[in-house]
Amino acid sequence: MHRSLTAACLLALAGPALADDVTTFTLENGLDVVVIEDHRAPAVTQMVWYRIGAADEPPGHSGIAHFLEHLMFQGTDDMAEGAFSATVEENGGTDNAFTSWDYTAYFQRVAADRLDLMMKMEADRMRDLQLTEDDVTTERQVILEERSQRTDGDPGSLLNEQMAAAQFMNHPYGIPVIGWRHEMEALSRQDALDFYQANYAPNNAILIVAGDVQPDEVRALAEKHYGPLAPSNRIKPRERPQEPPQLAGRRLVMQDERVSEPYLVRSYLAPERNTGDQRKAAALTILAELLGGNQTSSVLARNLQFDRKVAVWSAAFYDGTSVDPDTFGLYVSPVPGVSLADAEKAMDEVIAGFLESGPDPAQFARIKTQVRAAEIYGRDSAGGLARLYGQALSVGLTVQDVQDWPEVLQSITEDEVMAAARDVLNRDNAVTGWLTPPQETAQ
């Protein structure tokens, strides 16, 4: 770690965090543009975020959003197949893309004087992707192989997939981003083109440019390259089916001979961050850190790993940056000789004790300091800032929400954390899953 960075973080922890240097504007065709200045190095990150993800797919076409992400690296009228990434590499940069339930994003990291070229190429494929049947056949096999390796070949991923399907019986968050295999196998060229032509348009996108740039320069380049693109009149409102009230806890046991380290996971339905109202999500963020954010001092680790010595590891997770309600989760992996049933019982006892007594005040203060440090480190690179703002804006939050978030986290009280804990940590609102070798079954 550089000493200058350490000193800067210590100074920031002692007082209010510095505001990001952000400029925003919208082109006439509806493209939202965010410019984040960071002049420490002559480099720039360009990201284009589309407000379309796996939870927005038409029924029966699971995986089409991720499939299209792969196909976007095929050719256009002006660029041959595979030339996009090759050109980025020839200019000393890197590029990639990713898909979630709520968005699909593409990025390039290059020298600042290559931004003009990157915008030209990214704007070109926004509305002029050309696909052949061979392109689709080849890339469909690629995503099927990806599913085989990352999901079907990994018992933990299969458990996560089954738990999401059990948690979200009506909402599309229960459908895997990569897709169900039988639907992936049927995805066609026309499916991809229909999804692309309807949703990949300036009025459904956010352009983030972060690095050694000036807002006026970015505006001129955006007008030059993205400005002429026609908006889409086929973008649908993000009105997804919502979950009915969950009236009873749900359980599943996945047995797989490949499992060498059994564990249990419980996920509770939990609210998302909402624009202008982020306090409950902030309280849940602090709660996750208190319960399982540290392998030595968190509530679960201290009680299960060190005091009772029944767990090898434990964790808690929550990320409310989503369009709709998502999950708050707990993980526990027992030591050899302790059954999953006993580990679950111990976990429940620890959670019940926490709900009764609340957090240790000194630990609560330490957690907030650690959260503040993590926020500062997360904003320390242009690429990190681009991703931070892009993700938030893609799910309906605002620039102000992003800038307010660190101070909202710091202002959360113990009472707010405990109120959120009592509301969310309800067994009737949860799915509990066991991942185990074939010899251990549910009690």
Across the structure, where does each feature detected by a protein language model lie?
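Histidine-acidic residue clusters that define the catalytic metal-binding segment
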Residues: 20-25, 164-205, 238-243, 270-274, ...
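An aromatic/glycine/proline-enriched structural segment found at the starts
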Residues: 169, 177, 202, 206-274, ...
